[in-house]
Amino acid sequence: MTGAVAPPAVLVAAGGALGAVLRWRVVAATPTTEYPAGTLVVNVVGSFVLAALTFAAADADTMLLFGTGACGAFTTFASFSVDVVALVDADRPVAAAGHALGNLLGAGLAVALAWLLVA
């Protein structure tokens, strides 16, 4: 841990607090509709940020704080899964499939964009 700013657990916890608050703000700011757009936004943006940090070869402390901590708490593939099941339960299979594909393809495209911009 030579040169570390803080113990790894502290960096991850601080980043996690930041990411959780940011996710709450983004989801709260997203217009309420029948489609869970806030989940899509945080997953795509978080995937881009994590990929950019990775491709930029961020140092270990930066990755713990912003990668593992902030991006880990900001993104929410658990809520994404719950959203898909809720859409299926509401007899909206097309919306469920769109949400699933939107999150997965959006995250993948965000990673590709980060690679193009940073690598």
UniProtKB/Swiss-Prot annotation:
Positions of disulphide bridges: none
Alphabetized InterPro entries for the sequence: FluC
MF terms in GO: fluoride channel activity; fluoride transmembrane transporter activity; metal ion binding
One protein family per Pfam: CRCB
Topological relation to the membrane, as annotated: Multi-pass membrane protein
Protein localization: Cell membrane
Record-level GO cellular component terms: plasma membrane
Catalytic activity: fluoride(in) = fluoride(out)
Function: Fluoride-specific ion channel. Important for reducing fluoride concentration in the cell, thus reducing its toxicity.
Protein name: Fluoride-specific ion channel FluC 1
Organism expressing this protein natively: Halobacterium salinarum (strain ATCC 700922 / JCM 11081 / NRC-1) (Halobacterium halobium)
